[in-house]
């Protein structure tokens, strides 16, 4: 059977209230998160819990806006020993945004005032009982207009947490869900490739356009064994001129 994600949901009935509530004062906002450059915010956030701790490094090198924020969050979560909790909370948040058009639009609407965004995030975090690490991170995103990047940031963060646990993701695309025995066999084959010390995690995707067979994306490699690709290869072969 296809691997399905967890279906946890959260209530966001307070969102409308937050959006219509009075804006906070500038003084309040400056206390919550003083005006700093993005690099300063990320640096301060990532090192806030590091007094005299040993230096922690991210397991993967990340680039771009989403990569920088994901790396900063990873460092903060590891130092506060809340990595799994933060990962779970962000998963819940992203899933909730997928199920709520209003919340999703709020996250991506640049016209929403900063104060309104921050108030909404604070109330959402309180209702969902998110921990301090997650809440502080979301407030930074809200302050800097980066909530629209939350999906990409969480995806990059997931890559870091998997690397932290020694997990390697293999994406398997098929027309119908892969039977359990075939998934187990495929996982065993991939596990032999990565060797000991790492664990293969299979993510299944359904794509009827490949017509049949399967496509396996594993690390930097792609094994395309789909009927669609085979048909295209056969078509190219048949179009080639015959030389006798």
Swiss-Prot record:
Pfam family, one: OSCP
Keyword DNA repair in annotation: no
CC annotations in GO: mitochondrial inner membrane
Record-level Gene Ontology MF annotations: proton-transporting ATP synthase activity, rotational mechanism
Major site of localization recorded for this protein: mitochondrion
The keyword Membrane belongs to this UniProt entry's keyword annotation: yes
Superkingdom assignment: Eukaryota
Transit peptide feature, positions: 1-45
Localization of this protein: Mitochondrion; Mitochondrion inner membrane
Keywords: ATP synthesis, Hydrogen ion transport, Ion transport, Membrane, Mitochondrion, Mitochondrion inner membrane, Transit peptide, Transport
InterPro entries: ATP_synth_OSCP/delta_N_sf, ATPase_OSCP/d_CS, ATPase_OSCP/dsu
HAMAP family noted in UniProt: ATP_synth_delta_bact (MF_01416)
Subunit structure: F-type ATPases have 2 components, CF(1) - the catalytic core - and CF(0) - the membrane proton channel. CF(1) has five subunits: alpha(3), beta(3), gamma(1), delta(1), epsilon(1). CF(0) has three main subunits: a, b and c.
Free-text function comment from the UniProt entry: Mitochondrial membrane ATP synthase (F(1)F(0) ATP synthase or Complex V) produces ATP from ADP in the presence of a proton gradient across the membrane which is generated by electron transport complexes of the respiratory chain. F-type ATPases consist of two structural domains, F(1) - containing the extramembraneous catalytic core and F(0) - containing the membrane proton channel, linked together by a central stalk and a peripheral stalk. During catalysis, ATP synthesis in the catalytic domain of F(1) is coupled via a rotary mechanism of the central stalk subunits to proton translocation.
Family: Belongs to the ATPase delta chain family.
The protein, known as: ATP synthase subunit O, mitochondrial
UniProt source species: Ipomoea batatas (Sweet potato)
